[in-house]
């Protein structure tokens, strides 16, 4: 019960922030075929009940492949796009139609066995997407493969205003009545841009973008995306990342990539600070700045656990209030996640780096290095020549960053006289 109450308290600011916001959610055909699909539907219904305006875009690739195989047809691609001839279009229409019915049934059912028991909602679909043919590229005729020409923004917003969930399929229609097979990623991206959506949420097989070491990349700016695309090459994660960046460049506030295989990934991404996937956004996620008196409470929350473990020297609220101007902090969405302090040592050209701390959830993002660089820059600006640090647990971290072993005797007298021999901290120094 305590964990639930704690989670709800932490989620409450996000619940309020997401109300009446427009989210476009893209779920590929692989996600619909996955056993976790039912849980994703529950989470979408929960978002709807919390006042989120939802547009759901679904894919159909594996379902199309299954129908082609059943008919003995060979799929053809060029530039990673399906070539949709007449027989293939029949398979596309069949797959999309059945998927649409399956999604409508799942979203419309009375979820007797789900956490959202008794929920009722209205689902709307229609000819909201106008398309045009891709035509001929590199001498290859794409036939009925198309691209989005226009999204019926007014029509979709009218349905959202009436509290409906809007379902968009990867099919588009031309003014002359032709049907075109579309990429669901393109439909979702254009819908998010044209609707001025607050978020584009893209489901993939992975938790998000993984770096070359297999570690999750939690945050990106659109301008950082090309380097990752060059590394990824032609794969689906690259397609999702490219779609996320395009949406942000088109004015969408934030794009998220989460896994359809992880239960609760969508809710974790939307209602926790750390999230569960990769966030692509134009705005700055964090700020590195000097602390003010309003930050004292956040600093106490950050450093208290480390003080209790004996890693940091205890500082009372009164001490922090008096010394707040010595601190630099990293703030993320109102939460102080890292800090460090610079104390000039009297009657010398030396300073002390103290109280360097990073929230455990953010210790692999280089924030300690950012704070160290900020403290060193502040020290140089004040004319200091040497930076001392005292530590009981992180000697190697400082050695790796240019600090050399030192001693109490090498410290200026004003600081050496305050050395706590009971803590027996190791002393290091670095020439600036």
From Swiss-Prot:
Provide the disulphide bond pattern: none
Q: From which domain of life does this come?
A: Bacteria
Entry annotated with the keyword Cell inner membrane: no
Q: Where in the cell is it found?
A: Cytoplasm
SUPFAM superfamilies in the cross-refs: Acyl-CoA N-acyltransferases (Nat), Carbamate kinase-like
Where does this protein act, in terms of pathway? Answer: Amino-acid biosynthesis; L-arginine biosynthesis; N(2)-acetyl-L-ornithine from L-glutamate: step 1/4
Q: Which reaction does it catalyse?
A: L-glutamate + acetyl-CoA = N-acetyl-L-glutamate + CoA + H(+)
One biological process term in Gene Ontology:
L-arginine biosynthetic process
Q: Which PROSITE patterns does the protein's record reference?
A: GNAT
Q: Which HAMAP family does the UniProt entry name for this protein?
A: N_acetyl_glu_synth
Name of the protein this chain belongs to: Amino-acid acetyltransferase
């Amino acid at each position: 019960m305590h964990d639930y109450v704690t989670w709800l308290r932490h989620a409450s600011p996000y619940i309020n922030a997401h109300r009446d916001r427009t989210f476009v959610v893209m779920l590929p055909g692989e996600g619909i075929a996955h056993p976790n699909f039912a849980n994703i539907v529950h989470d979408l219904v929960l978002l709807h009940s919390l006042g989120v305006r939802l547009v759901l875009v679904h894919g159909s690739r594996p379902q199309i492949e299954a129908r082609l195989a059943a008919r003995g047809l060979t799929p053809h691609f060029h530039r990673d796009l399906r070539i949709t001839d007449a027989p293939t279009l029949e398979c596309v229409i069949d797959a999309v139609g059945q998927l649409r019915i399956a999604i409508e049934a799942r979203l419309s059912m009375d979820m007797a066995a789900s956490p959202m028991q008794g929920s009722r909602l209205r689902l709307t679909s229609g000819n909201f997407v106008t398309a045009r043919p891709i035509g001929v590229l590199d001498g290859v005729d794409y036939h009925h493969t198309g691209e989005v020409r226009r999204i019926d923004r007014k029509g979709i917003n009218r349905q959202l205003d009436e509290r409906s969930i809007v379902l968009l399929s990867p099919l588009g229609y031309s003014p002359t009545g032709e049907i075109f097979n579309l990429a669901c990623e393109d439909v979702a991206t254009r819908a998010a841009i044209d609707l001025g959506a607050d978020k584009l949420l893209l489901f993939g097989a992975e938790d998000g973008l993984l770096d070359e070491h297999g570690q999750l990349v939690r945050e990106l700016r659109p301008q950082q995306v090309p380097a990752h695309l060059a590394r990824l090459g032609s794969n689906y994660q690259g397609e999702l990342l490219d779609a996320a960046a395009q949406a942000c460049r088109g004015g969408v506030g934030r794009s998220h990539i989460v896994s359809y295989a992880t239960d609760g990934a969508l809710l974790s991404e939307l209602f926790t600070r750390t999230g569960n996937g990769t966030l692509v956004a134009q705005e700055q996620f964090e700020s590195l700045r000097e602390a003010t008196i309003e930050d004292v409470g956040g600093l106490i929350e950050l450093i208290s656990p480390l003080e209790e473990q004996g890693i940091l020297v205890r500082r009372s609220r009164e001490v922090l209030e008096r010394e707040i101007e010595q601190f630099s902090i990293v703030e993320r969405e109102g939460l102080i996640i890292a800090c460090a302090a610079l104390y000039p040592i009297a009657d010398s050209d030396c300073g002390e780096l103290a109280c360097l701390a990073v929230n455990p959830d953010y210790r692999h993002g280089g924030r300690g290095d950012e704070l160290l660089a900020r403290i060193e820059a502040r020290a140089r600006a004040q004319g200091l020549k040497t930076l001392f640090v005292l530590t009981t647990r992180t000697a190697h971290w400082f050695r790796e960053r240019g600090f050399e072993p030192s001693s109490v005797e090498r410290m200026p007298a004003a600081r050496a006289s305050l050395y706590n021999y009971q803590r027996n901290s190791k002393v290091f120094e670095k020439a600036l």
